[in-house]
Amino acid sequence: MSKQHTAQAPVDPIVLGKMGSSYGIRGWLRVFSSTEDAESIFDYQPWLIQKAGQWQVVELEGWRHHNQDIIIKLKGVDDRDAANLLTNCEIIVDSSQLPELEEGDYYWKDLMGCQVVTTEGYSLGKVIDMMETGSNDVLVIKANLKDAFGIKERLVPFLDGQVIKKVDLTTRTIEVDWDPGF
């Protein structure tokens, strides 16, 4: 099929994108990048995919823009049938490949699952997702089951210093200056 090599499972896998439908008859695929700048997905190599429970390394042969899409060519994937077998595969790398961040900057993956508490000590819940709004990122927080305000989900802007007072990845807590009733 393709030039995919069996690989060991990554220690700390992170999904950078997903392979979409095939494009053309020569094995090209659409790719959906989850990186902030879509083209940054190509800065992280090698890519890993998981097929039938097995980790495999896939080698990028080339890529280009096509209309609004990015399409890729993988080594050894030379026809539409081979490309179709990779549709919906997540593109994964080990997080050790990501660059170190400056103090006060965080990868979204590191914030997922953190408990969010107010400066007064009220537990708002757990971060389950992040959203990009253009002006700032937003924490999507699943409220605790017995939330005193009957809220199921909260959206809290990730404004460092203004709303976000402290992030402690060791204890997996984020302290915020936020009204729990909002």
UniProtKB/Swiss-Prot annotation:
It holds the Pfam family RimM. GO terms for cellular component: cytoplasm; ribosome. The keyword Chaperone applies. SUPFAM superfamilies: PRC-barrel domain (SSF50346), Translation proteins (SSF50447). It is found in: Cytoplasm. Residues 102-182 form the PRC barrel domain. GO terms for molecular function: ribosome binding. Belongs to the RimM family. Binds ribosomal protein uS19. This is Ribosome maturation factor RimM. It comes from Klebsiella pneumoniae (strain 342).
